[in-house]
Amino acid sequence: MPKIIELPEVLANQIAAGEVVERPASVVKELVENAIDAGSTQITIEVEESGLSKIQITDNGEGMAQADVAMSLRRHATSKIKNQGDLFRIRTLGFRGEALPSIASISHLTIVTAADGEVYGTKLVAKGGEIESQDPISTPVGTKITVENLFYNTPARLKYMKSLQAELAHIVDVVNRLSLAHPEVAFTLLNDGRQLTQTSGTGDLRQAIAGIYGLTTAKKMVEISNSDLDFEVSGYVSLPELTRANRNYITILINGRYIKNFLLNRAIFDGYGSKLMVGRFPIAVIDIQIDPYLADVNVHPTKQEVRISKEKELMALIKSAIAQSLREQDLIPDALENLAKSSTRGATRSVQTSLPLKQTNLYYDSSRNDFFVTPETVQEDIKPLVSKSESSVSSVANKQQPTVKQAKRSADDSDSEHGKLDYKNKSKLKRMLENLTNEETSTFPELEFFGQMHGTYLFAQGQGGLYIIDQHAAQERVKYEYYREKIGVVDSSLQQLLVPYLFEFSGSDYISLQEKMPLLNQVCIYLEPYGNNTFILREHPIWMKEEEIESAVYEMCDMLLLTNEVSVKTYRAELAIMMSCKRSIKANHALDDYSARDLLVQLAQCKNPYNCPHGRPVLVNFTKSDMEKMFRRIQENHTSLRDLGKY
């Protein structure tokens, strides 16, 4: 008796549903994408109990002919592709012919549809993938699909559904992404009769952003645009002052399809450089138009993973588009808005009975204000990246040394905020180190210093109004740019080690490093296999001080394993960040007028005077208009959606 049998179609569909239909939001995604492919301009999504009880999608698309309705429930039945060649020219959102039969196999499904030119429409009812009835019906052109009792015959899947609020949040996210991908379609989302999302369908992406994220957010979005022979990149990104705590507000679209791509996310962060605070993420909608031949969407049934040819070229295009648009903006945050966002509810009002004034000293005391960036002060921090002197070498040689030395990973720096970074946690490093080297010179307002508060903040005025400067962040930026230039120079010479070092790795890392060893050789690190999962280092590059060999080699290897790249500049930039932070003036340090003015002059000469190396703002701005609003001299005007075109 044969052991291998062909599974019944309903069972096969239920198995496929395990990948295609993960939760109610998956049903919404697949059915709305079908509606978009049908040419709909209005789509209404109605759900009950976060989609577990009922999901209904109504559109005004081309509908289905009577003969096609039953066929749509057959596996791999589709109108999107006809032959193998079409698989490489996919411009529709759906093409596999799996979604509708998979959904039907785990729910009670009703389809009401009519095609243009048909006398009657069709109503089809199916339960568990089996068609129970199909009748003619009078209905307008378009399609209405109702999915009820989702997962009724797969209790294991139903058991592990999250809370109703969590499932609803996934549905809202799906509809929001599709609304941003297709601003020409008017979307309406209702849950238990309550409207959650509505977009106008005008085709204006900024209007769609306003409908989803709000008018205030839309006003702080910057348009980007760039193209080459293969790609067209457009969309909007938020100003650096408008960020979120996670990546969920980044939407990347390829030919109208929302995708997830780590490298393209990285290109967005690279475009911002050091303008983002560590741990903060921008709001972005990046629309990429690409020849279908360069994108393989047939990777996963959910079609959210796409393989892209010429991915590095696309990353460079996105990065330059964002960087160019931000260079054209005034990046000094509006202080009045920051105050409104950071105000504390229920804060007690302080009563001030007097306004004591302190006369500012008009002299310069170098002993009090050791903060000027000079070659001498830099030399104190940056030790020559050269070999030891002959005397030190001879003294080491006279001591008894083992034939090899076991390298150890260095302990974490005691300064948790500004200590050494872990290359295995690269999210901070990518934004805080690699991007710092790509900054370009920015225009900076001409400021006139006039005071200091609490030994921490400097006050200056300019044509733009009142400016408040964080003196520590300002000097940190000044010193960082100076240090970066000094330690960015790399000497590729090698020096023999008197005692070689052994570096031990896990089995998988050891194999990966053997394959990627040519990349380490490019930065003059030559590791040789030496026993089980161990490498030996017999010589080190001049740019690497001997006391940092162990930590530097391990960090460079960690960088290579995680990013497939290795960069001396990135590693040395970390040192520049640490030195600039530790050598900068701290809070509660009074500056005399000469020192404060000179700090502002040096800040104005920086390539990026707006943020410290960690991404914190250096200064904020109160405009004359802001001051007049605070003192009720003028009333704030409220902007409507129709005014968005002015920004």
Swiss-Prot record:
CDD domains xrefs: HATPase_MutL-MLH-PMS-like, MutL_Trans
Chain spans, region Disordered: 389-423
Keyword Metal-binding belongs to the record: no
SUPFAM superfamilies to which the protein is assigned, alphabetical: ATPase domain of HSP90 chaperone/DNA topoisomerase II/histidine kinase, DNA mismatch repair protein MutL, Ribosomal protein S5 domain 2-like
Residue stretches of biased makeup (Basic and acidic residues): 409-423
PROSITE patterns with a match to the protein in the record: DNA_MISMATCH_REPAIR_1
Record-linked SMART domains: DNA_mis_repair, MutL_C
UniProt keyword terms in alphabetical order: DNA damage, DNA repair
Listed GO biological process terms: mismatch repair
Record family assignment: Belongs to the DNA mismatch repair MutL/HexB family.
Job description of the protein: This protein is involved in the repair of mismatches in DNA. It is required for dam-dependent methyl-directed DNA mismatch repair. May act as a 'molecular matchmaker', a protein that promotes the formation of a stable complex between two or more DNA-binding proteins in an ATP-dependent manner without itself being part of a final effector complex.
Protein's name according to its UniProt entry: DNA mismatch repair protein MutL
Species of the source: Streptococcus thermophilus (strain ATCC BAA-491 / LMD-9)
Record lineage: Bacteria, Bacillati, Bacillota, Bacilli, Lactobacillales
